[in-house]
Amino acid sequence: MNSSSWSAPDHSHHPALHTAADDDFHQYLDINDMGDLSDALDFDFRDFGADHHTAPHAGRHAADHLLHPSGGEHLDTPMTGTDMSMILSPVDHAMLRHGVQQQQHHQQQQHQQHQMPTITTTAPYQNAPTALIQPSTPSEAIVNTIDAQIQFLQQQKLHAQHQQLQEQQAAFFASQQNHIVPPTPQSLELTAGSSQNYYAQSTLSDQHHSGPQKQQQPQQAIDYRYTRIKDQHDMSFTPLVSPAVTPLETHFPIDTPFAVPGAYFSPLTSPALHAQNDALGIIDQRLGMMSGSSPREMELEPPAMSQASVSPGDLARKTRKNAVKARAKSGSGIKQSPISKPIRRKTATTPMLNPQALNQLVENAAPSQERQQPLTPLIPTSSSSTAGVTDSENGSISPENLNDVVLPVEMPPPPLPKPRSAKPSPFLAPQASGSAVPINLQPGRPGIASPATPASLMKLSSPSNRNPSVVGTGSHDPMDPDHIENFELPDSINFSSAPKPAPIITTLGTPALDPLQKAAAPLQTPGLPPPPSPAVAKPLALPSAALSSPQLKPDSAHSLKRTPQLAPMGRSSKKRASVTSIQMSPALRPKISPSIKPLLPGGSAGAEDAASILLATKSNYQRILEGNTVPGVSYPSELSTNLTSKRTSHKIAEQGRRNRINSALQEIATLLPKAPAKEGGDGDGDGHSSSGGGGGSGGADREDKREKDKDKAGGGIPNSKASTVEMAIEYIKQLQKEVADANKRAEEAERKLVEMKMQGGAATGSGSSVGDAGDLGTPTTEANPVVDEDLKSGGGDAMDE
């Protein structure tokens, strides 16, 4: 059907077309009540871009296929005489096709995921007659279709965006479940330093591949949040990470950036490998720093060699001090430096250690000493200093290999005698065979170079012991303070670098030269050895030089060790001398111990008075009671009254106690018998005789005491409290014994009385029966007096009790 077939009169035949079309479009926009639209609609979405430029006939064909699959009238056929016909057809066609295709796509997604109800169209819409769909007027139909299509497309766009977000989230979680790396103890031990770099690199690569940064940021946030939650959940079920964490602790100190999959973008270049590489790089840097510290000694080589060419002693001092400082700074680096350095030191010095080479060097130095006196001492000294400081291969005389020569000679502690052997340098004296001037210069100037080695600097505390022997040399005086200044720095280095054999061996070299050439010296020129060195001047060094050097060196070693001990001994002796001097002084302390005044030669009595005054005034209670207080110190007025009341109350209580004691003693003295000695002696004698004896000695002693008391008292009354108490004690004991005897006799009397009553009852019964009362009465009369006596003596008391 062409567009010309549509006529205006056709619209007049359908007056209800407008309302019917509105109802149909509302039904079409009702998404929940729509049927299956895909069965009735079939569009090609790929021609959307080209449809904007198509002819009106293509739009009419698409509209015909949309609303009239079996043929019929067209809703979008342009009216004759209208200007909107050319614009309506292509736009309507494109928008409808786009909406239908989006609807079909969402229906498939919803059938798969069952997340949203299906969007379908109603079946009656397909069977709607074309007559009812046709609008009443062309303008109203066009407006209604445009509004309906716009609303439908807006709804479809919103649903499409929502569905796209859901699909992205589902795809993201599905990919995360496949790519998440569970945390392990190794991954937990990693440092989080390099994880930020990896995370940043991964995000940049993802941005280049995925798209704009706006989409990447929410994904990163979701990724970080999700992996952190999952790591905490997984870590609660993993075994113990460390002994300090209990299985019940679910919150572990985890570095979450390493759990993000972006950190594990490659199995080979993992953060663990990169972290290890960083650590190795740091270690390499440390090794570089340590190795860089060792060449400091090598840098000292040129100035040390330049000393041989430059004569002034100031340069030697400066280089020596710099060498000592460099050693002090690079002591730790020397420890951790490669082993090749000490090996090179040994190999470099071995050809120079032969005694022949040393003799040649000495011979070469001897003529130079004769020519140039200021330069000659620096030649061997600079070489020895370079040997100790820089280990030079050409100009070093440091005889390390002479350690082998010293061992058969049985050297005691090797490191101690270095400076002494270096200062005298007797090997130059006999071979030089010159005047005494170079000999005097040699022991002085070699001492300048000897402190180059740290061990020699350590033992420079005793040059004061050697300075008196070497008087002619004027170089010792300026150098001794230098040695003293440089003494403690090598001390710490030596303790720290004790395992190093090099400084110890270099110190052994110079002592080793002495015994060998001292052995040759007395044989060739016996007169020369005494002047050059103070050690040779000793009488012990003359008989055998080879054996004399070890004897001298232990002495020097002991002297070095004892120097710190001699000082305190000297101090102690001074202290003792001061104590003895105080004792030898007039000794005021015992006489006037509290006095502060030191010496009062003529006023000893005045000093005693002052002491008594001080003792009297020292009592703070007395001052307070008298009101004499120290200026600036005020005491409350109640304190004096309290003190007085305390003292008076104490005195009263003490006096009352004494009065009670005295009154009690007086009362005891009155209760005591006037002549208790005889009665007590008789009582004791009677008691002992009655008990069977054996207490005569105790009774005699008591009688002696009582006689003495009688003599003292005169009238039997004790003259002292002690005698009164003693007499009271004896009297109490006597009374106790008498009471015990009386009780014993009373018991015996009661027992006899009971027996007599028993016998008397039996006798009366037998007498009445037999009639022999006269015969039985005679024994009773004989026995009755005994019973009466007993009753008289103790029976009465027993009955009373």
UniProtKB/Swiss-Prot annotation:
Residues 292-317, 366-607, 628-725, 756-801 are annotated as: Disordered. Keywords: Activator, DNA-binding, Nucleus, Transcription, Transcription regulation. Residues 690-699 have a biased composition (Gly residues). Residues 446-540 are annotated as: Interaction with negative regulatory factor. Residues 645-735 form the bHLH domain. Residues 477-486, 676-687, 700-713 have a biased composition (Basic and acidic residues). It is found in: Nucleus. Pfam families: HLH (PF00010). This is Phosphorus acquisition-controlling protein. It comes from Neurospora crassa (strain ATCC 24698 / 74-OR23-1A / CBS 708.71 / DSM 1257 / FGSC 987).
